[in-house]
Regions:
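Active-site-proximal catalytic alpha-helix in oxidoreductases
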Residues: 1-19, 32-40, 44
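NAD(P)-dependent Rossmann-like dehydrogenase/reductase catalytic/cofactor-binding core
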Residues: 26-87
Length: 87
C-alpha cells in the first residue's frame, strides 16, 4: 500500500495542483522516473531529497501557503515524517 497505492494518491494530488496551470502532468514524468530509479541504487532513506529533508522551513512555509486545507494536512504530515527520520 505504501509503495503503490499511496504513491498513486500523491500523483493524483500533484495532477490536481497542476489542474489550473498550463503545465501538463506529463511534465512530472521525468522527475517521477528519476525518483523511482534512485531506489535501485540507494536505500529509500538515502534517496530522500527536498525541503523537509533539508529542514528548509522557508520553502515549506511557502509551499503551505499555496495549498488548500486538505493538501496542507497531507504535506505537513509527510514533511514531519521525513524530518523525523532525518534528525
Amino acid at each position: 500500500v505504501y509503495a503503490c497505492n499511496f504513491t498513486n494518491l500523491m500523483y493524483t494530488m500533484a495532477a490536481e495542483l497542476l489542474k489550473n496551470t498550463h503545465i501538463p502532468f506529463s511534465a512530472l514524468l521525468p522527475l517521477i522516473d528519476e525518483t523511482a530509479a534512485k531506489i535501485h541504487a540507494l536505500a529509500p532513506a538515502d534517496a530522500q531529497t527536498g525541503p523537509a529533508r533539508r529542514n528548509d522551513e522557508n520553502v515549506m512555509n511557502h509551499h503551505l501557503a499555496l495549498l488548500n486545507d486538505e493538501q496542507r494536512v497531507v504535506y505537513s504530515i509527510l514533511s514531519e515524517a521525513i524530518k523525523k527520520r532525518n534528525r
